[in-house]
């Protein structure tokens, strides 16, 4: 992101975001890639939107027997507070974080997803 300080633009890292690594289905990642292209966004923003909507619901149903077999490592960033809330939610639901992340894909609202250029926003410093 950029900050406007004394009339000058200064590039800074967004300190509210946290990097994380997880293992999710390759099929889901491919679907998210296509969705992000269609809606001019990033996979991380799509997932973040799904997390928010799922947490607002407060509960999910997940069958551990139907876990995907094609999980691969995936790295992205997310709002740090949101990621912590997601981890707590996974513990309360007695699920792995990977399972909760995959379930959140069903809660993505593409009308409310951040644009790909959000990371280049200008904030007043």
Describe every region a protein language model picked out.
Residues 1-70, 77-81, 88-125:
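A detector of short terminal or domain-flanking linear segments
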């Amino acid at each position: 992101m950029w900050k406007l300080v004394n009339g000058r633009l200064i590039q800074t890292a967004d300190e509210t975001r946290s990097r994380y690594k997880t293992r999710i289905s390759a099929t889901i990642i491919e679907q998210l890639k296509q969705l992000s292209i269609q809606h001019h966004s990033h996979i991380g923003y799509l997932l973040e939107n799904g997390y928010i909507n799922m947490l607002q619901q407060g509960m999910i149903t997940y069958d551990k027997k139907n876990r995907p077999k094609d999980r691969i490592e995936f790295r992205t960033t997310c709002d740090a507070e949101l990621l912590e809330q997601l981890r707590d939610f996974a513990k309360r639901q007695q699920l792995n974080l990977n399972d909760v992340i995959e379930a959140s894909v069903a809660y993505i609202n593409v009308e409310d997803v951040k644009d790909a250029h959000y990371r280049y926003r200008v904030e007043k410093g």
